[in-house]
Amino acid sequence: MAEYKLLKTEGRAKRAEFHTVHGTIQTPVFMNVGTIGAIKGAVSTMDLQQIGTQVELSNTYHLHVRPGDKIVKQLGGLHKFMVWDKPILTDSGGFQVFSLAKLRKIKEEGVYFNSHIDGHKIFMGPEESMQIQSNLGSTIAMAFDECAPALAERPYVEASVARTTRWLERCKKEMNRLNSLEDTVNKNQMLFGINQGAIYADIRIDHAKRISELDLDGYAVGGLAVGETHEEMYYILDETVPYLPRKKPTYLMGVGTPANILEGVDRGIDFFDCVYPSRNGRHGHVYTNQGKINLFNQKYEKDMRPIEEGCQCPACRRYSRAYIRHLLKAKEMLGMRLCVLHNLYFYNTMMEEIRDALDAGNFRSYKEEKLYNMGQIDREKEMSGQKKFY
């Protein structure tokens, strides 16, 4: 069922369509993050439809511990559970296992750790992650991997990447088995492998070559935006992405800001996800084409303009900065909800603009104009070769 159709290119940037059992994804795309099956900020799947969301992302670990993946399967899978008929990507739970668990023990078979909810002991390995994601019935499942710290010592990273490769082979074998079962929720579930290697470009390149041989449905670059600088992240993408299959979707995990996304697209990335738009929105920080603003600032107390003039999101079509600020100050849920809706709409609309620019063959000029308007680059410094990344 999966088919990746490359429509246009500009440098390394790609404009494509990814056909899945739950619909066609136009890329580049930003996936809206609903960790536990919902976007934080009282955002419904009906809202997601209205603001142009193409793909929702949920988390394997969190849905496993609550309400339980077996319960979700009994209820018909995550799509029916959420009332969402478009693509869903589930990440493997690996990042949460390695970042949330204070007590964990890594072995070849997998990881032992304690639940963040009640402390009970949990084991998760490649097979368990695939089984949970199969129960959820997501469109795209992510391979179980270890996300090594960005500044980890080289010997540790080498051992970690080798183990991640072995785990990926086990993930592929288990997914093939699960997709063949009669009672599987989604027999067309796809598997994306994850490139790791911290900030060691040669390890990343070697790993990219190895996992590319497995002929998976797509590939992700993981383990970035976890402590390294933006310059280091872009360097790793420059070095690594060319060694991943160009005719398969490429996903940059957990990234990021609007500037990060523009730079990622320029380096050949198709899929992005990040909690920034919802997290920032819940704290009154909203995105505009002139940069991010904090609605808690007193200067917006009597500002009757929408968050952004011309924006067609549910917040901007009806409400003023002053009113939304009042709601936020009063800790009224509606204020947070409106900010989250605006930010997600901003991201989704920016991705549509990126796709339009690639279709028209002017992505580079769009990117530079967007970064300049948002205050992310100084054109004089850029011309002199002193460009700074944000």
Task: Place the predicted regions along the sequence by residue.
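Conserved, mostly hydrophobic/aromatic
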Residues: 23, 56, 91, 133, ...
